[in-house]
From Swiss-Prot:
Gene: rnfH
Disulfide bond sites: none
PANTHER family cross-referenced by the UniProt entry: UPF0125 PROTEIN RATB
Family listed: Belongs to the UPF0125 (RnfH) family.
A Pfam family: Ub-RnfH
Name of protein: Protein RnfH
Classification via HAMAP family: UPF0125_RnfH
Length: 96
């Protein structure tokens, strides 16, 4: 018997370019597997999948390799921070 397919999306964004890739995956597919299947690294080769932080609709998922997706989920791949948010606030406060 065929496994049930669910619709999900994989998203990645840079300041000048964004991409959302819709996918039909079998139920039980993990966030990590969906990102691999999406082929998003062809568009953004700088993504390091094994160390990339991921989330679902803005909520971080600590273990993308074991997080099973649900119908309609959007897997977001997060870029590393360039500067610590606390340091950025301090820098802005110093500038006045």
């Amino acid at each position: 018997m065929d496994k049930l397919k669910i619709q999900v999306e994989v998203a990645y964004a840079l300041p000048e370019q964004q991409k959302i890739i819709p996918l039909a995956v079998v139920e039980g597919t993990t966030a990590y597997e969906a990102v691999q299947m999406s082929g998003i690294t062809h568009f953004f080769p700088q993504i390091e999948l094994d160390s990339a932080k991921m989330g679902i609709f803005g909520k971080s998922i600590p273990e993308p390799k074991s997080h099973a997706l649900r119908e309609g989920d959007r897997v977001e791949i997060y870029r590393p921070l360039k500067i610590d948010p606390k340091q950025a606030r301090l820098n802005r406060a110093k500038k006045g």
